[in-house]
């Protein structure tokens, strides 16, 4: 019988909230007896926006804004049914996008 893995990708704009959520998932998985690989930091995505400061002339005067998206990857190896139940009941912080994939 093949072992199953749970792959969890987390995304957030604030890395502190992301790291706290990642640690919460790791603690929950280890408490239920599963083996955890990670967290693996993935490359950050930086979106930059340049806008004119004034509504009229003076094109040389501009503001730049950026949005940084931080990402983490977790692999849970051989999860038990208790692990899956605990992860489903887990309530993470607002602003963290969670993507879960089940792999064989």
From Swiss-Prot:
Keyword terms, alphabetized: Ribonucleoprotein, Ribosomal protein
Any one Gene Ontology BP term: translation
GO MF annotation terms: structural constituent of ribosome; tRNA binding
Pfam families: Ribosomal_S10
Domain of life: Bacteria
InterPro entries (alphabetical): Ribosomal_uS10, Ribosomal_uS10_dom, Ribosomal_uS10_dom_sf
Gene Ontology CC entries for this record: ribonucleoprotein complex; ribosome
Physiological role: Involved in the binding of tRNA to the ribosomes.
Record's subunit section: Part of the 30S ribosomal subunit.
Family the UniProt entry places it in: Belongs to the universal ribosomal protein uS10 family.
Protein name in the entry: Small ribosomal subunit protein uS10
Gene name tied to this protein: rpsJ
């Amino acid at each position: 019988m093949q072992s199953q893995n749970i792959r969890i990708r987390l995304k957030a704009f604030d890395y502190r909230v992301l790291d706290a959520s990642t640690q919460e998932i790791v603690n929950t998985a280890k408490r239920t007896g599963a083996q955890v690989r990670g967290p693996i930091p993935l490359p950050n995505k930086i979106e930059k926006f340049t806008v004119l400061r004034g509504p009229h002339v003076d094109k040389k005067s501009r503001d730049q804004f950026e949005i940084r998206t931080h990402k983490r990857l977790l692999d849970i190896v051989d999860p038990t049914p208790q692990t899956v139940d605990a992860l489903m009941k887990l309530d993470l912080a607002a602003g963290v996008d969670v993507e879960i994939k089940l792999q064989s």
